Amino acid sequence: MYQRDGNHTMITIKFDEKGLVPVIAQDKTTKDVLMLAYANKEAVDLTRSTGYAHYYSRSRNKLWKKGEESGHLQKVHEILVDCDEDAVIYLVDQLTAACHTGYRSCFYRRLDGTVSGERMFDPDEVYKKSE
Amino acid sequence: MYQRDGNHTMITIKFDEKGLVPVIAQDKTTKDVLMLAYANKEAVDLTRSTGYAHYYSRSRNKLWKKGEESGHLQKVHEILVDCDEDAVIYLVDQLTAACHTGYRSCFYRRLDGTVSGERMFDPDEVYKKSE
């Protein structure tokens, strides 16, 4: 996954003051943008070492393996970095859907509220409520 | 560009504590992710009213029309919002290239430093140094 030919230097990602970098998850095949999330260094390192997308949840303040609850894992084929080295793309194979709402992509609505995305599952079936 | 059919409600974007929202500029045709930048409310409003991508520069602390210096404008066809309403996609027609380095996309390198993108112009020719 990370071939080195000796002529290139690993890019050092610039994490922000909270230690995070925004990550765009993009479907490797359809090129749809699936989600925007954040990663800390540990999440990027785990993504590289395991080949599966890891993020850092800002609301739960914890490292997060995408799909750990739903099973909707993201297999990461490549990591791209932008010119400023402060934003990242994970090029992924997405199992089922990226969004917890059941849509394939989190970006399933236009600004006017109309729906442009495709729903892949019923979240009530996937994220079981505790009884 | 923003048809309303009466059954949908305009989404209210959640700007962060700095008044910004991350914006992914995606090529409408190739679906390449071109750049990740930030917008404040004024930038989103101007994008909607003019049809051209506007952002807010965090380094220069000012509103910024993409291409105002280089001429590499982004005509915005659609604005998508994510499930949490705190991230946005501009679906654009990109003139020439998005990146100030001359590459079509700002995400022209892999994490290992190898180049995957295509260079479209020489930045020294486009961003003239003052003499």
Swiss-Prot record, chains A, B:
Keywords: Amino-acid biosynthesis, Cytoplasm, Histidine biosynthesis, Hydrolase, Magnesium, Metal-binding, Zinc. Its cofactor is Mg(2+); Zn(2+). Its EC number is 3.5.4.19. GO terms for cellular component: cytoplasm. Zn(2+) binds at C83, C99, C106. Pathway: Amino-acid biosynthesis; L-histidine biosynthesis; L-histidine from 5-phospho-alpha-D-ribose 1-diphosphate: step 3/9. Mg(2+) binds at D82, D84, D86. Binds 1 Mg(2+) ion per subunit. Binds 1 zinc ion per subunit. GO terms for molecular function: magnesium ion binding; phosphoribosyl-AMP cyclohydrolase activity; zinc ion binding. One of its GO terms (biological process) is L-histidine biosynthetic process. InterPro entries: PRA-CH (IPR026660), PRib_AMP_CycHydrolase_dom (IPR002496), PRib_AMP_CycHydrolase_sf (IPR038019). Transmembrane segments: none annotated. Its main location: cytoplasm. It is found in: Cytoplasm. It catalyses: 1-(5-phospho-beta-D-ribosyl)-5'-AMP + H2O = 1-(5-phospho-beta-D-ribosyl)-5-[(5-phospho-beta-D-ribosylamino)methylideneamino]imidazole-4-carboxamide. It holds the Pfam family PRA-CH. Catalyzes the hydrolysis of the adenine ring of phosphoribosyl-AMP. Belongs to the PRA-CH family. Homodimer. HAMAP family: HisI (MF_01021). This is Phosphoribosyl-AMP cyclohydrolase. It comes from Methanospirillum hungatei JF-1 (strain ATCC 27890 / DSM 864 / NBRC 100397 / JF-1). The lineage of its organism: Archaea, Methanobacteriati, Methanobacteriota, Stenosarchaea group, Methanomicrobia.
